[in-house]
């Protein structure tokens, strides 16, 4: 029996909890030792916190617990310092928080790397505490951030000087190798028991949510793969699944088009090289190929090739190549379609099998 792995909390959750504790100290004089927080999915959690109250400001510190996930930020101290201001809630990045220096990310250039969901979580956590008509400045810092950021993809993404405040659900799902990989397989059994012969394989919860909420794909047919796309494809063959739709962000699934089936960025990250090679084969100029290689995200690549002669059908052909490589992996024993999404959940490209599968489920646009 596979032991259940312990979940942890994102940097965004820790920052929101620390912000709430600092706000309580600043406005109400309460120096709490634990703080209760509601996560984006409605789950209520309680985190231990240390609070220091000064005359004009308050600071709260939460130690990040990543659970059983091998996370570089596990055990780091996330600080939030709160100060009163005339109106509104302002977020600032302090020591160890990276600054976005290149376009294509979810945060504008020049802003601290605090992603949209954590920003909303932080503001929601303190909104009811700040008196009407008044405001507060919140400065988030991670003293070890600059050092730890060198062990992440932030430097390659153009996020300089520190770590990012991340998270979409507030929860860190454990991703330790064999145990976690094995724990994913029962999802297939449950889906088959529900009567599905076609499954959706998606690397993460953002893709899962977009599939369900934006496109109406059946929730019980959606399988989370994390980075183990190849392993789950082979598990589908073993269980005689008939069709699979690979579904997710283009930056993840483009790796499959290059024959990469374990997609963790520490093991394989050739996104730009794969796209550049396929663009060159489609007729891209040398200048465009160089710009693709210099881009940091798929969204940035979209802007590079927008309006080019080869753009029409390019992302569809990339999706088709991912499907072909996946089909080759399982020796043709599975019919595979692929749909590539951007960060907003819009379909960048999909092949004919993906269109057919989505059409069978009532989405035929």
From Swiss-Prot:
<protein>
    <recommendedName>
        <fullName>Cobalt-precorrin-5B C(1)-methyltransferase</fullName>
        <ecNumber>2.1.1.195</ecNumber>
    </recommendedName>
</protein>
<dbReference type="GO" id="GO:0019251">
    <property type="term" value="P:anaerobic cobalamin biosynthetic process"/>
</dbReference>
<keyword id="KW-0169">Cobalamin biosynthesis</keyword>
<dbReference type="GO" id="GO:0032259">
    <property type="term" value="P:methylation"/>
</dbReference>
<keyword id="KW-0808">Transferase</keyword>
<keyword id="KW-0949">S-adenosyl-L-methionine</keyword>
<comment type="similarity">
    <text>Belongs to the CbiD family.</text>
</comment>
<dbReference type="GO" id="GO:0043780">
    <property type="term" value="F:cobalt-precorrin-5B C1-methyltransferase activity"/>
</dbReference>
<keyword id="KW-0489">Methyltransferase</keyword>
<comment type="pathway">
    <text>Cofactor biosynthesis; adenosylcobalamin biosynthesis; cob(II)yrinate a,c-diamide from sirohydrochlorin (anaerobic route): step 6/10.</text>
</comment>
<dbReference type="Pfam" id="PF01888">
    <property type="entry name" value="CbiD"/>
</dbReference>
<dbReference type="InterPro" id="IPR002748">
    <property type="entry name" value="CbiD"/>
</dbReference>
<dbReference type="InterPro" id="IPR036074">
    <property type="entry name" value="CbiD_sf"/>
</dbReference>
């Amino acid at each position: 029996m596979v032991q259940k792995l312990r979940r942890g909390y994102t940097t965004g959750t820790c920052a929101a909890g620390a912000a709430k504790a600092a706000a309580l100290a600043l406005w109400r004089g309460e120096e709490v030792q634990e703080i209760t927080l509601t996560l984006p999915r409605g789950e209520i959690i309680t985190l231990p916190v240390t609070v220091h109250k000064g005359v004009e400001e308050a600071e709260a510190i939460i130690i990040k617990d990543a659970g059983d996930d091998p996370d570089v930020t596990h055990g780091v101290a996330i600080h939030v310092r709160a100060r009163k201001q005339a109106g509104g809630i302002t977020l600032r990045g302090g020591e160890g928080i990276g600054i976005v220096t290149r376009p294509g990310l979810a945060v504008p250039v020049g802003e601290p790397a605090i992603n949209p969901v954590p920003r909303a979580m932080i503001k929601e956590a303190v909104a009811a505490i700040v008196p009407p008509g008044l405001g507060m400045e919140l400065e988030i810092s991670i003293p070890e951030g600059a050092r730890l950021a060198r062990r992440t993809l932030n430097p390659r993404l153009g996020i300089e000087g520190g770590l990012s405040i991340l998270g979409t659900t507030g929860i860190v799902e454990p991703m330790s190798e064999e145990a976690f990989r094995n724990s994913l397989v029962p999802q297939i059994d449950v889906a088959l028991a529900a009567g599905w012969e076609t499954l959706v394989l998606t690397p993460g919860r953002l893709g899962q949510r977009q599939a369900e909420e934006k496109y109406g794909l059946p929730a019980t047919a959606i399988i989370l793969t994390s980075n183990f796309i190849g392993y789950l494809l082979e598990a589908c063959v073993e269980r005689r699944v008939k069709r699979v739709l690979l579904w997710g962000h283009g930056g993840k699934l483009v790796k499959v088009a290059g024959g990469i089936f374990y997609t963790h960025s520490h093991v394989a990250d050739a996104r730009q090289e794969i796209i550049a090679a396929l663009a060159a084969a489609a007729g891209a100029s040398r200048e465009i190929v160089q710009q693709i290689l210099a881009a940091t995200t798929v969204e940035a690549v979209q802007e590079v090739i927008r309006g080019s002669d080869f753009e029409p059908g390019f992302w569809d052909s990339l999706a088709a190549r991912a499907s072909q490589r996946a089909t080759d992996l399982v020796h043709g024993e599975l019919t595979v379609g692929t749909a590539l999404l951007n960060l907003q959940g819009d379909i960048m490209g999909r092949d004919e099998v993906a269109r057919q599968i989505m059409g069978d489920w009532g989405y035929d646009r």
